[in-house]
Amino acid sequence: MIAPQRMLMPEGRPPAGLTTGLLIFLTFLFGISQLYEDFKNHFVLTPNSLFDIDLGKLSLYPLMHLSYLHLVFNALAIVGPLNNFESSHGTIHTGVVLNLSAVIAGIIYCVVSRLLSLETGVAGASGWVFTFITYLCVKESQLYPRLELSRFIPGVTQSIPTQFTPVVFLLFTAIVFFQSSFLGHTAGMIVGYIMGYGETWFNILIPPAWIIEKIEEKADPLINLIPFGIKFYRSTEINTDDGYRSFFPGQEVLPTTTPGNVLGTA
C-alpha cells in the first residue's frame, strides 16, 4: 500500500512552509468569494483571457475554487505531491514552479479552447494536482517502470506503466467528476510531463540558485516568523545528490541527477 507519510512528511521532515501557506491562502480566498460573489470573476480563466491580454488570470486561476467540495478535494489531492516536491527542491523554487506551471497550462488551455471554439472558464488547483502527480509518476517510473495496482487495490494483480498512471487518473477524474475541466486537467498533466522529462528545458525558465539564495537572504526576517513545526526549505539545504526517493514503502533510492541537476538548480 502507498505510504501517505512519505508524501505528507518526507523522511519524517516537518510540513513544508509554502504547501501549508497555500492551503491556508486557498481557504481564505474561498471565504472571501462567499462574501463577495463578483470576487471570483477576477480569477476565473476564460479562453479569451490570453488574447484579451488579461494576463493576471493566467497565474491566478488556480487560487480560486467554485465550491466547498471543489476546495476540499483539491486541497487533499495537492498537499502530498506538493509537500514532497517542496521538501526536495526548496520553498522559493517551488513557488516559482507553481507560477510557471500555472501560466504554461493556462496558455495551453486558452490556445486549444480557441481552436476548438470553447468558451468555458476554469478555476481551481486541480491543474496543479495533475502537474505534480505527473512529475512524481515520471520520477517513480525510473525506479519502477510498472505500477502494481495491488498497492492501491488489494487482490488486483494487474499493473500499468508508471509514467502513464496520470492518464488513468485523468480518465477516472473525468468520469467521477464529469463536470470538471478535462482540458484544464490535461494541460496540467502536460506540464507535469514537461517537468519530468524536460528538466533541462524547464531550467531555463527558473532563476539560478544564487538568485534564489539572495531572495532568501532578503526574506530572512519574514522566514523567521514561520511558526514552529512548519519548515521553510532553503535552497542551501537541498542536497541534489540525494536523488528521487519513492513514496512507496521499503523501496530504494534511484539517483535522478545524472546527468545534470535537480530541476532548477543549474
UniProtKB/Swiss-Prot annotation:
Annotated membrane topology: Multi-pass membrane protein
Record GO cellular component, one term: Golgi membrane
GO molecular function, one term: serine-type endopeptidase activity
Annotated keywords: Golgi apparatus, Hydrolase, Membrane, Protease, Serine protease, Transmembrane, Transmembrane helix
Catalytic-site annotation from UniProt: 126 (nucleophile), 185
Signal peptide positions (record): none
Origin superkingdom: Eukaryota
Keyword Isomerase attributed: no
Cross-referenced Pfam families: Rhomboid (PF01694)
TM segment ranges: 16-36, 60-80, 92-112, 118-138, 164-184, 192-212
Annotated catalysed reactions: Cleaves type-1 transmembrane domains using a catalytic dyad composed of serine and histidine that are contributed by different transmembrane domains
InterPro entries on file: Peptidase_S54_rhomboid_dom, Rhomboid-like_sf
GO biological process, one term: proteolysis
EC number from the UniProt entry: 3.4.21.105
Function recorded in the entry: Probable rhomboid-type serine protease that catalyzes intramembrane proteolysis.
Entry's family note: Belongs to the peptidase S54 family.
Protein name, as recorded: Rhomboid-type serine protease 2
Gene designation per UniProt: RBD2
